[in-house]
Amino acid sequence: MGKKNTRNTKGRIIQAAWRLFYQQGYDDTTVEEIIAESGTSRGSFYHYFEGKDALLSTVSYLFD
């Protein structure tokens, strides 16, 4: 059950970031907005990503 939750949480963060980056642009999107959109916590965000730049690298790789 832990692995499924892990993938779910990370996936929700990535999907939320993609939506917000697309709608608002990378520079105008904050980590707080990504956290709110994904329904996760600040701790979860930083557990998976060092910051917004690291998240952008993942989003770019997955959606390229």
Where are these regions (language model features)?
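Residue-level detector of secondary-structure transition/capping positions
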Residues: 21, 63-64
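Short hydrophobic/aromatic patch on the recognition helix
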Residues: 39-49
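Nucleotide phosphate-binding site architecture
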Residues: 27, 46, 61
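Alpha-helical DNA-contacting segments of helix-turn-helix folds
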Residues: 49, 56-63
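Basic, helix-initiating cap at the start of DNA-binding domains
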Residues: 1-24, 28-40, 54
